[in-house]
Amino acid sequence: MNLHEYQAKQLFASYGLPVPRGEVAYNVEDALLVASQLSTSRWVVKAQVHAGGRGKAGGVKLVSSKDELAAVAKSMLGTRLVTYQTDARGQPVNAILVEETCEIDKELYLGAVVDRATRRVVIMASTEGGVEIEKVAHETPEKIFKVVVDPLVGVMPFQCRETAFKLGLKDDQIKQFTHLMMGLGKMFVDCDLSLLEINPLVITKSGQLICLDGKINIDGNALFRQPKLKNMRDVSQEDDRENRASDWELNYIPLDGTIGCMVNGAGLAMATMDVIKLHGGEPANFLDVGGGATKERVSEALKIIVSDEKVKGILVNIFGGIVRCDLIADGILAAVKEVDVKIPVVVRLEGNNAQLGAEILNKSNLNVIAATSLTDAAKKIVAAVSE
């Protein structure tokens, strides 16, 4: 789950991390009220969307008067912002962040991720702030300094000081950075984060460190124990199909192909997608219905798949372990009738009562094709969508 910048900064502030003064606004009047409460004569207006690249897309503006602020707020709110990280439709701008400006002397980068290789939280810092860290890692990896955090003791002060020295910080800045980095490490673990970025972390001309921008991703598997963070979720920034799938505990990821996939088991789903590509097709989604492939869940999964206008055919690949394949076949046919699926559906059943399930599918008068193997299923669905 992603947070907006203003939500990330609220979280930063609660852990003692320095952020610019500012507030979120949902209309022009709110924006003007926020500006009147700030001490600077110029303000930064930022569109709040779950996407990077806002500056280049016109989602970050510097304004010098109340009239200019009102005009910018009016032009942003209620629109959709298209950046290199969004699709062609863009993301809806329902809120803006109005902040004080600051005099920037230097820009740094500070972030944290869960590193699969070390199975630890790794904090990364760089002198190349304001630039995508992926670009820095590709072009000048020597400018990224990494700190592996021991899960038993957390971030240690000596690690913070060593990193501060590498960043070229001096005197009081080292003390500020130590406080900031330790707060970041504690927040990362306390809040079950999967990604945290402060880019840029700026040094002002008065020598103060400020988190000028913030990005936070929360581990969706841990939301059950993060009720306050869960309430910050903005579903308007998410894919409708993914939201519906989440409500039914279905694992759904949209892709760019034309063949919808419904499979029970993540590994089997990935193998199914591979076989589709092997035979010349392109999967339109990853969808794992899990172990409980009931009629209701199958029906909802089909609704989600057919709501994608790109889908020209559906491949259902179910392994009947505890659940009998004949019951799954009945559920698939009932779901096809309920959803009124017009496109071809190829079903491959394997396991408990698989033969009986295939007979049930073959005897139906619906546009449902039974396959004898995964290879056979892939060939049949690719042929069906090619007609």
UniProtKB/Swiss-Prot annotation:
- Keyword set includes Transferase: no
Q: Per UniProt, where does ATP bind?
A: K46, G53, R54, G55, E99, C102, E107
**Which residues make up the binding site for substrate?**
N264, G321, I322, V323
Ranges for domain ATP-grasp come to 9-244
The EC number(s) this enzyme carries: 6.2.1.5
Q: Can you state which reaction this protein catalyses?
A: succinate + ATP + CoA = succinyl-CoA + ADP + phosphate; GTP + succinate + CoA = succinyl-CoA + GDP + phosphate
Q: Which GO terms describe its biological process?
A: succinyl-CoA metabolic process; tricarboxylic acid cycle
Record Gene3D superfamilies: ATP-grasp fold, A domain (3.30.1490.20), ATP-grasp fold, B domain (3.30.470.20), Succinyl-CoA synthetase domains (3.40.50.261)
User: Which is one GO molecular function term here?
Assistant: succinate-CoA ligase (GDP-forming) activity
UniProt KW keywords: ATP-binding, Ligase, Magnesium, Metal-binding, Nucleotide-binding, Tricarboxylic acid cycle
Per its Swiss-Prot or TrEMBL entry, what cofactor is needed?
A: Mg(2+)
Specify which residues bind Mg(2+) according to the UniProt entry for this protein.
Answer: N199, D213
> Which PROSITE patterns does the UniProt record give?
ATP_GRASP, SUCCINYL_COA_LIG_3
Q: Which GO terms describe its cellular component?
A: cytosol; succinate-CoA ligase complex
> How many cofactors are bound and how?
Binds 1 Mg(2+) ion per subunit.
Q: In which pathway does it act?
A: Carbohydrate metabolism; tricarboxylic acid cycle; succinate from succinyl-CoA (ligase route): step 1/1
- Pfam families, per database record: ATP-grasp_2, Ligase_CoA
Concerning HAMAP family, the annotation shows: Succ_CoA_beta (MF_00558)
Similarity comment text for this entry: Belongs to the succinate/malate CoA ligase beta subunit family.
**Its biological purpose:** Succinyl-CoA synthetase functions in the citric acid cycle (TCA), coupling the hydrolysis of succinyl-CoA to the synthesis of either ATP or GTP and thus represents the only step of substrate-level phosphorylation in the TCA. The beta subunit provides nucleotide specificity of the enzyme and binds the substrate succinate, while the binding sites for coenzyme A and phosphate are found in the alpha subunit.
> How is this protein organized at the quaternary level?
Heterotetramer of two alpha and two beta subunits.
Q: What is this protein called?
A: Succinate--CoA ligase [ADP-forming] subunit beta
Q: Which organism is it from?
A: Legionella pneumophila (strain Paris)
Q: Which gene encodes it?
A: sucC
